[in-house]
């Protein structure tokens, strides 16, 4: 496996969550996108459709946004009103990814490792895949990119029938420690040991 995130290095967990929230809200609430700091905080700390659930502070989110802005993964704008600073993602352009691949990465970063069928169902609001084989094709493409893999197919867990896929935006997924939580957390815990 090749580590993701290119020459800029891997993202931390909150940075990946912020990007995923921006991608999600671009599709699900287009009238409110780009997002304000408050709406981004609410999306990051949302209790539904998140694995794991966070309690990130405003200052933590601001620091992560600054890191993402320096990497050109987040853009700042003042929107139509010109009064409130708003944030938009730039992941697709930076990594040269189609919308389907961006949707899969966002879904994995929001909800943790998933099977192909779970990904198809959970990413439907972001991108409508024709069938499970098209999801698998995009995942294979993301796993074998010349610029570095952005996803990995995890080994089957005991008792499971299907492989799960995890994102590599935060670096290599820690295979033994990976039990459905975010690859970023597992990778971060391993690096702290």
What label would you give each PLM region?
Residues 1-20, 27, 31, 65-96:
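Intrinsically disordered, low-complexity serine/threonine- and proline-rich regulatory segments
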Residues 12-34, 96-113, 139, 143:
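Positively charged, polyanion-binding regions of nucleic-acid-associated proteins
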Residues 29-55, 113-129:
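Short acidic, hydrophobic short linear motifs in intrinsically disordered regions
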